[in-house]
Regions:
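Low-acidity, Ser/Thr- and Arg-rich intrinsically disordered low-complexity segments
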Residues: 1-13
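The feature marks proteins involved in alpha-glucan
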Residues: 11-40, 68, 77-81, 89-185, ...
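Structural beta-strand segments of beta-rich domains
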Residues: 42-46
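Conserved, mostly hydrophobic/aromatic
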Residues: 48, 97, 188
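Short proline/glycine-enriched turn/loop motifs at strand-loop junctions of beta-rich domains
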Residues: 49-55
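Beta-strand signatures of extracellular beta-sandwich domains
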Residues: 57-59
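Surface-exposed loop/edge segments in extracytoplasmic proteins
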Residues: 65-72
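Phosphate-binding active sites in nucleotide-utilizing proteins
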Residues: 190-202
């Protein structure tokens, strides 16, 4: 599983077939930037912008993406960014967001926590997108048209974000340890520099 053994002390998993838990796991304040979900080697910082939302839930899913196992409310709000830090959460974990706020179409507000949202800064997505009119925030065919609200949950069919580790694995390579006074930085256009190189295949 995409978490360390110590995670089980702070996070309660949901037994198969049981309801989603809204427990209070170990969540720190984190930072409002960078936006998105960022793994730092020890845990993840979660940051989502919204100027008008009232609260944001960070939702975790089992590896198949079909079952939601946890919802964690982001505890802080800074410069219109909801944020929190979750220690021990590791790359590979599937996630999404539920955003709570006013449903006032006349004012341009269509917050609907029944609709799982994809992280706009996600670096990797898991699962196919299966079209359904449940993705609309309003009820198709309703006499109130787009002023109505559709409360069908979309979590099962919506692709999920995947936490990734951005750190590059250098393997046996080491820094050249060359002094700056002995260094020349040369910016070049790849095609212009290599197009006529005799040892490169055409």
């Amino acid at each position: 599983p995409p978490w360390s053994s110590s995670r089980n002390e702070a996070w309660s998993r949901v037994p198969r077939g049981a309801a989603v838990t809204r427990s209070a796991p170990r969540v720190w304040s984190g930072t409002p930037y960078p936006l998105g979900v960022t793994f730092d080697g020890r845990g993840v910082n979660v940051a989502l912008f919204s100027a008008h939302a009232e609260r944001v839930e960070f939702c975790l899913f089992e590896p198949t993406g079909q079952r939601e196992i946890e919802r964690i409310e982001l505890p802080e709000y800074t410069d219109e960014v909801f944020h929190g830090y979750l220690p021990d959460l590791l790359p590979g974990q599937l996630y999404g967001f539920r955003v709570h706020g006013p449903y006032q179409p006349e004012a341009g507000h269509r917050f609907n926590p029944a609709k799982l949202l994809i992280d706009p800064y996600a670096k990797l997505l898991s699962g196919p997108f299966r079209w359904s009119n449940a993705y609309f925030g309003y009820r198709i065919g309703s006499p109130r048209e787009d002023l109505s609200i559709d409360r069908r949950d979309t979590a099962r069919s919506m692709p999920k974000g995947v936490i990734v580790d951005d750190a590059f694995q250098w393997g046996a390579e080491r820094r050249p340890a060359r002094a700056w006074e002995d260094t020349v930085v040369y910016e070049a256009h790849t095609r212009g520099l290599t197009e006529r190189h005799p040892e490169l295949p055409h």
